[in-house]
Amino acid sequence: MKRVELEGIPEVRGTVCPPPSKSGSHRALIAASLCDGSTELWNVLDAEDVRATLRLCRMLGAEVDVDGEERLEATVSGFGDSPRAPEDVVDCGNSGTTLRLGCGLAALVEGTTILTGDDSLRSRPVGDLLAALRSLGVDARGRVVRGEEYPPVVISGRPLRERVAVYGDVSSQFVSALLFLGAGLGALRVDVVGDLRSRPYVDMTVETLERFGVSVVREGSSFEVEGRPRSPGKLRVENDWSSAGYFVALGAIGGEMRIEGVDLDSSHPDRRIVEITREMGAEVRRIDGGIVVRSTGRLEGVEVDLSDSPDLVPTVAAMACFAEGVTRIENVGHLRYKEVDRLRALAAELPKFGVEVREGKDWLEIVGGEPVGARVDSRGDHRMAMALAVVGAFARGKTVVERADAVSISYPRFWEDLASVGVPVHSV
């Protein structure tokens, strides 16, 4: 499905259950691989990015048996504190999470590990993370372009020290990589220098490690990791608020959506979509096992800081296209280091619907209006594809989304679920 055509409709109506959390699936697989024993993981996402992490863990010596489709059951027999050197280059595909967290795991290997990915991943900087590993005594090198380091990366040797500093303003995954490294070592102090972007994703890493018996003590901008992971026996990955957000947006713009299997008490940073949607004027109420989102017929522009929830930016931008007034999304400069430069991509694609968009270094402004159908390009980015589909679902006329298959990275059933709530979806 390279290209999808949508026909705009007045309202959506239906029920969806979003897929398992991509972020949670990555973290659970890695934590289980760091154990000496066996762990049963339930509700693991079956999507390209998570398959990349499965491949990484297996290449480092974990035995992973997988059963099911879409929502996997995975039995992981970990490699403990002694991952083996991979026999081949680790291909992380398009998964930045796999590559960055994999750098931390590679530092535990007695030998050399090479990690790479597709063209998009090889354009994403990892210099700050590699510099942190080098400060621990690890030989860590990337491809140098104009003073910055990019994949492929080559990592050899184990850490010689028990304290490390890392900048937190490019990617929170650099911090998470070092926390997993600390768990593998049994002890490490991680000092975060400067602003920590997307801190709730670091909180997810800490929560995962704590569920595996690792102590992580936070003192200001530092994290003290003590103890090695121990299998909890069984662990269930929660459903994904990032994926749920697109259907929250659909219900807010027009109609009513019932979204099952999401937890309003979750620590997932993208749960904030509920708060933002209410602020814009939609109704959201809790039901047993999920939420119901209902349009009130009018959305209003908001000013919102999404520094801690960057994956919500395309979703909020899609809603903003239908809101009265201006929506300003601030402190999201780190979006420029995602699969694509999402700020630039949104600023280029949304105007094709007839919407006015202004872009700054770390902000985006959208002037709401009456979008009309257009031919738009996801640029191979899964979140762009789904956000553009939200706009196309209500835009007047037909919308064509190019590179629609990008959704397979995190939500393989997205187009089927979109059709199930009344949006005419055609593969063209």
Swiss-Prot record:
Q: Which CDD domains match?
A: EPSP_synthase
The organism's superkingdom is given as Archaea
Q: Give the family, as the similarity comment puts it.
A: Belongs to the EPSP synthase family.
E.C. numbers: 2.5.1.19
Family matches, as HAMAP family: EPSP_synth
Name of the protein in question: 3-phosphoshikimate 1-carboxyvinyltransferase
Record's function text? Catalyzes the transfer of the enolpyruvyl moiety of phosphoenolpyruvate (PEP) to the 5-hydroxyl of shikimate-3-phosphate (S3P) to produce enolpyruvyl shikimate-3-phosphate and inorganic phosphate.
Where does this polypeptide localize? Cytoplasm
Query: Which Gene Ontology biological process is one annotated for this entry?
Result: chorismate biosynthetic process
Can you tell me which residues bind 3-phosphoshikimate?
A: 22-23, 27, 171-173, 198, 311, 338
